Amino acid sequence: MKILCVAEKPSISKAVAKILSGESTRTRKTRAKYIMNYDFKFNFPQYGLCDVTMTSVVGHITNIDFPPEYSWGKCPPGRLLEAPTLEVVSQQDVFKNIANEARTANILMIWTDCDREGEFIGWEILQAARLTNPSLTSENVLRSQFSHLERNHILHAAKNPLLLDLNAVKAVSCRMELDLRVGASFTRLLTDLFRKSSVANASMDKDKKSNVISYGTCQFPTLGFIVDRYLRVKSFVSEKFWYISVDLKMENDGEVQLVPFTWTRGHFFDRLFVTLIYQDCIANPFGKITKVIRKPTSNWRPLPLTTVELQKDCARIFKMSAKDALDAAEKLYNKGFISYPRTETDQFPQAMDLKELIGKQSQDTRWGSYCSELLHEGKYRTPRGGKNDDKAHPPIHPVNYANLSALDNDKLKKVYEYVVRRFLACCSDDAKGELNTVTLQWGKEEFTATGLAVIAKNYLNVYPYKKWESSKKLPNFIEGESRSITGGKMKEGKTSPPNHMTEPELIGLMDANGIGTDATIAEHIFKITNRGYVVKTKQRGTEYILPSELGMGLIQGFDRIEFENISLSKPFLRKRLENSLQEIVDGRTTKEQVLREVIQLYRQAFVQSAQKGNILLQAYKDIIDSNNNP
């Protein structure tokens, strides 16, 4: 019996073949660059000893497009919302290799990434195989389930395959068709509109990226977040406020210490109100210590690592873009060093042997001794569990040890070290401390002072990306004692504007609002940057994302049109689509139903956009004029 196995990437194909064959394969070149065919034998429990060929694709091998008669300029853009589509083979040599190898295969086993996109690529592989072997169908094609390249895990995946998830295939097909129809129709509409405008066209020539005004159902809500924050910063008007502060001079360990107390009411924007309270306070030369509370406190170790948290932390800690972080994680996964990096799961399965993974890291000079403490000194703790489980992959974690000096570049080193340290922190105890809170009553008002003493750093000893330090020790206050007020003052402050958008904030907003998935968020940010809709700028060492003139004009233009029951710049419609796609996966609705409903909404928006194109152009012109005449 012959079994054809197909992976999503050449590196995965090579690694899986090496494991299943016991490092004994016959390698054949193909006409497709980077792709090899590996021949070997493997004993499948249900089939016995089989001849196996392991090969791969390089992502998608087909895509959907419109027939030639619907190409740019040959039909009105609005026609694309209901025009026929056709499937096009985008990688002919890869497609033909699968078809040739499937000709003599009895069974097809899919080894693509275990997510929706991987499921659809598996379907594409099946279609290529059926070209020469119609006996291969969705009812008998096998699908391996794996999340990393550890030997026993791969052997288990080979021996316990499932079937393709056809609902996931339909969900991806639905998303691809909607992205094509909506993206192409609006892109052609906007581009034609702006090219015909002398003002817009002259401005766009400054940046070749802007010659095509590309629209995407995820990119525009993402851009909308950035524009919204920019406008909040720009329109911010600072307000004065007033508050009361108190300092007590105390002797502490032989030294005079000034202890600041904070007003429990915070601050007020009414100066007269605060003045009256302050006058009542200063009539009392003494204050009374009403409470002294000492209680244990903890700084919780992190939850197991998800894709979104990986991207946010790499942006915050290493100033690395979300795309660069995910690309580095993908390379580490392909090399077998970490688990699959696209996951929403923040809880480890109970049956997973985490101590074995810790043991593999014991040889490292940086964190090896810490691993030994976890394993041999009773410091290991079961990781906390979050609320999310995508049922496909565990949290991101190290699978095999990698010496940092052997990794190709700094980004790989930083991401690998972060993944390892995060994992070890998850398996550690929370940091422990004591929080000392003193309450002072001055007149009728209450003020508090706090002091933190860190007793045991625990996970913080291996996780340097978070700071939790002891504050200056508070003197020994006694409950009920009176103290002379040495520094009671009424002070003035003013409100500060919000900061412009940072990439970690943007990732969090996209995740919370259902814009894209954990796996595609980075790509959407990259696209709006590459298309010239936003620019990145550094201020005082922090990188912010600001809208360009074009990005601002597009969002404000769509907002001025005031669509009925829809917004092209807000996240609601895309979030609704993502929820509908999940319903397709769950079997609660159909691809056809979702297509009908969503296309109808976008059709209404398209008609209004076409009718009110002058509003879009005017919004862009207003932005240019305001920047030229500030």
Residues of each region from the PLM?
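Intrinsically disordered, low-complexity regulatory segments
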Residues: 1-188, 486, 497
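C-terminal or mid-to-C-terminal helical accessory/interaction module adjacent to the motor/catalytic core
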Residues: 90, 96, 103-104, 149-246, ...
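A conserved hydrophobic secondary-structure block that centers on an alpha-helix together
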Residues: 113, 313, 317-321
